[in-house]
């Protein structure tokens, strides 16, 4: 009976540990294009623990301190180097450079996200777009990257993963 009680207490103590990790292996990407503004805007939302795991192999590391006043001088170059490897966007057959124009932290604890934004002007009207998003698929076999695309009044959504790394849209 005592062994059963100890096992029950141990199981109860493990519940918060098991439930505290964010259960979703996903990222969100939103791409917007307005023909009036002739600008393509990209926003990526990533779990901060996943970013840390990818860059410094420790999900709970505070070494880089993204989007904080004392952000490490290595934080943005490391993040940009990773993003260039795993995310690309072509507009009208032209590869657009991945940049980091903004970084914002949101949420709290395990659910803290890092939002990254950038935009590019387009000289010609948008006719086609190819999105490659394999963010964190090298770390997590079940990673899914949800992409929302809004072009004027036309909207599309897709789920990209290791098995489906890219998608092309024609407008």
Where are these regions (language model features)?
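Bacterial N-terminal signal peptides that target proteins for export
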Residues: 1-11
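N-terminal soluble domains immediately following signal/targeting peptides that reside
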Residues: 22-171
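Intrinsic disorder/low-complexity segments
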Residues: 11-14, 163
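N-terminal signal peptide c-region/cleavage motif recognized by signal peptidases
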Residues: 16-18
């Amino acid at each position: 009976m005592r062994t059963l009680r100890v096992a029950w207490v141990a199981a109860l103590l493990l519940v918060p540990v098991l439930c505290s990790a964010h259960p979703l292996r996903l990222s969100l990407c939103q791409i917007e294009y307005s023909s009036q503004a002739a600008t393509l805007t990209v926003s990526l939302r990533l779990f901060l623990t996943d970013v840390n795991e990818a860059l410094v192999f420790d999900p709970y590391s505070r070494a880089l301190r993204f989007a904080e006043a004392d952000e490490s001088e290595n934080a943005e170059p490391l993040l940009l180097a990773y993003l260039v490897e795993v995310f690309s966007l072509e507009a009208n057959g032209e590869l657009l450079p991945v940049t980091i124009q903004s970084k914002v932290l949101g949420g709290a604890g395990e659910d803290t996200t890092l939002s990254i934004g950038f935009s590019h002007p387009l000289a010609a009207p948008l006719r086609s777009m190819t999105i490659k998003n394999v963010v964190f698929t090298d770390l997590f076999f079940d990673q899914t990257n949800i992409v929302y695309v809004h072009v004027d009044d036309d909207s599309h959504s897709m789920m990209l993963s290791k098995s489906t790394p890219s998608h092309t849209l024609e407008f």
